[in-house]
């Protein structure tokens, strides 16, 4: 409400101690905190009575964002647009999540680091409380420059954006079912990295580390399948029978 655009985050106590802790002692503040806590609890539990499948899928993808700034941004959106019962317009919320995903992913490429993202996000927070649609109008990307950055970016496994990108790609498929947020997923090299190091059967290691050779995969499967040839991996991807019963395959449709 104060339209603060500064990217320097004010200390929590300093913010609330103004006017003799008037804001902190307000009944409305406590009620708003309860509503916000309930919202995030339902996000965490993937409450299908509160959110549509398409919204829950976008929230799953954002859970693997390269940083946590989207959560603060979403909190501001919720507090401004919630109905009296704490609900949101589903289609409008879905559009907001899609725009947020696109911007956060792209900005992580062109301006890496959490601190740099604060400037456009804080400015857009002000637009939200003014009732304006999220558009990031003052932070448009140059298409050719962005393509150059994307094409030259090294998507190593240690970089958070790598898992962000392949999670987003997996959920671009309408056939991809919603997975639990408690599922531990890792990055799978479809052509195993260890096989390349042993056999040197590809022309370049860059091919092994390219996005096209990577997919998200549940940790329980990735541990078993990590060093196998693709023909052997399919057994673990699809699931198989053992004397003790069936071993489930991956839920990743890709």
Model-derived regions, located:
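A cross-family structural signal marking well-folded subdomains
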Residues: 1-164
């Amino acid at each position: 409400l104060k339209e603060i655009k500064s990217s320097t985050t004010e200390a929590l106590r300093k913010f609330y101690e103004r006017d003799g802790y008037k804001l902190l002692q307000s009944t409305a503040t406590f009620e708003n905190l309860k509503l916000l806590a309930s919202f995030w609890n339902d996000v965490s539990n993937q409450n299908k009575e509160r959110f549509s499948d398409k919204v829950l899928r976008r929230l799953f993808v954002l859970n693997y964002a390269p940083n946590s700034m989207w959560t603060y941004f979403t909190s501001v959106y919720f507090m401004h647009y919630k109905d009296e019962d704490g609900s949101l317009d589903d289609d409008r919320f879905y559009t907001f999540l899609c725009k947020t995903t696109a911007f956060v992913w792209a900005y992580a490429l062109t301006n890496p680091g959490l601190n740099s993202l604060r400037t456009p996000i804080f400015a857009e927070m002000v637009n939200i409380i003014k009732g304006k649609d999220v558009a990031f109008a003052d932070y448009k990307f140059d298409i050719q420059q962005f393509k150059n950055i994307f094409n030259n970016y090294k998507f190593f496994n240690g970089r958070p954006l790598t898992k962000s990108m392949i999670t987003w790609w997996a959920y671009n498929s309408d056939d991809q079912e919603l997975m639990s947020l408690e599922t531990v997923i890792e990055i799978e090299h479809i052509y195993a990295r260890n096989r390349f190091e042993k056999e040197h059967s590809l022309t370049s290691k860059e091919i092994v580390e390219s996005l096209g050779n990577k997919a998200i995969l549940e940790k329980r499967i990735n541990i078993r399948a990590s060093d196998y040839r693709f023909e052997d991996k399919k057994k673990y991807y699809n699931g198989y029978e053992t004397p003790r019963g069936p071993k489930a395959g991956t839920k990743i449709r890709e």
